[in-house]
Swiss-Prot record:
Its main location: secreted. GO terms for biological process: immune response; negative regulation of myoblast differentiation. One of its GO terms (cellular component) is extracellular space. The gene is Ccl9. SMART domains: SCY. This is C-C motif chemokine 9. It is found in: Secreted. Belongs to the intercrine beta (chemokine CC) family. It comes from Mus musculus. InterPro entries: Chemokine_b/g/d, Chemokine_CC_CS, Chemokine_IL8-like_dom, Interleukin_8-like_sf.
Length: 122
């Protein structure tokens, strides 16, 4: 019976931590949405790629970066398998980009130079 109790305890702990991570992520997402709405008057729809609900990670990069369509960005978390920059478009979509790509770096520089700071770091 001991393996059963161990497995049951692990399952309960995993479920509890998973719910906590979802609540934390939902709170952070609402904070980013509120910040963008206050600055741009936009209602943001968040789209997440992959199965990791507790953090935003890029599974692939978009090579077609059009900086004029973005209002902000934030880096992926340290828990992701690959580094990434997630740009937020004027329409509220998230676009993953390769942080070592020179076009991505120039876009970040432009966003930082525009009127108000618009980096949304988690």
């Amino acid at each position: 019976m001991k393996p059963f109790h161990t497995a049951l305890s692990f399952l309960i702990l995993t479920t509890a931590l998973g719910i906590w991570a979802q609540i934390t992520h939902a709170t952070e997402t609402k904070e980013v949405q509120s910040s963008l709405k206050a600055q741009q008057g936009l209602e943001i729809e968040m789209f997440h790629m992959g199965f990791q609900d507790s953090s935003d990670c890029c599974l692939s990069y978009n090579s077609r970066i059009q900086c004029s369509r973005f209002i902000g960005y934030f880096p992926t978390s340290g828990g992701c398998t690959r580094p990434g920059i997630i740009f937020i478009s004027k329409r509220g979509f998230q676009v993953c980009a390769n942080p070592s790509d020179r076009r991505v770096q120039r876009c970040i520089e432009r966003l930082e130079q525009n009127s108000q700071p618009r980096t949304y770091k988690q």
